[in-house]
């Protein structure tokens, strides 16, 4: 069973709370155990929590959830881009899958609401698949024919 953590940004909470509900439902459907749900003030704060979560033995993968809504300036672009970069950095450094379920940049509130379920489900599904495939790869042995991990 995959032990999954979820990190969800509180900013744009009307959207991210719906994302969290959909993510939890989908994790249960996939048979994953949710070991932690951690809220951060915003998307930009997610990487700091990730550093702590990936160090925990009871976390195999993490799904991140958030919504960065377009404003009058390029602030949304800065927040989403920097958060995504750091999230990937932490995943590579830790060797644990961390998936990006962050809506934006450039999305308006209506677009974000339309994407709630899709982004939440995809983030959870990718985290669970990656954790399972990493485990399968660790346990795989090459014996002269192609090893296929799916």
Swiss-Prot record:
GO terms for molecular function: 6,7-dimethyl-8-ribityllumazine synthase activity. Keywords: Riboflavin biosynthesis, Transferase. It is an enzyme of class 2 (transferase). Pfam families: DMRL_synthase. InterPro entries: LS, LS/RS, LS/RS_sf. It catalyses: (2S)-2-hydroxy-3-oxobutyl phosphate + 5-amino-6-(D-ribitylamino)uracil = 6,7-dimethyl-8-(1-D-ribityl)lumazine + phosphate + 2 H2O + H(+). The active site is at residue 75. The keyword Transferase applies. GO terms for cellular component: cytoplasm; riboflavin synthase complex. Its EC number is 2.5.1.78. GO terms for biological process: riboflavin biosynthetic process. Pathway: Cofactor biosynthesis; riboflavin biosynthesis; riboflavin from 2-hydroxy-3-oxobutyl phosphate and 5-amino-6-(D-ribitylamino)uracil: step 1/2. The keyword Transferase applies. 5-amino-6-(D-ribitylamino)uracil binds at residues 11, 43-45, 67-69, 100. Belongs to the DMRL synthase family. This is 6,7-dimethyl-8-ribityllumazine synthase. It comes from Pyrobaculum aerophilum (strain ATCC 51768 / DSM 7523 / JCM 9630 / CIP 104966 / NBRC 100827 / IM2). The lineage of its organism: Archaea, Thermoproteota, Thermoprotei, Thermoproteales, Thermoproteaceae.
């Amino acid at each position: 069973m995959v032990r999954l953590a979820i990190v969800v940004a509180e900013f744009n909470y009307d959207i991210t709370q719906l994302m969290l509900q959909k993510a939890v439902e989908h994790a249960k459907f996939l048979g994953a155990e949710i070991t932690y749900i951690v809220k951060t003030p915003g998307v930009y704060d997610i990487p700091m929590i990730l550093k702590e979560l990936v160090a925990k033995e009871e976390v195999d993968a993490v799904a991140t959830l958030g919504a960065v809504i377009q404003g009058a300036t390029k602030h949304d672009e800065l927040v989403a881009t920097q958060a995504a970069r750091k999230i990937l950095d932490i995943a590579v450094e830790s060797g644990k899958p961390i998936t990006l379920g962050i809506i934006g940049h450039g999305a308006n509130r209506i677009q974000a609401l339309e994407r709630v379920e899709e982004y939440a489900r995809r983030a959870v599904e990718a985290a669970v698949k990656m954790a399972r495939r990493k485990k399968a790869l660790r346990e795989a042995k090459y014996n002269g024919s192609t090893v296929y991990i799916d």
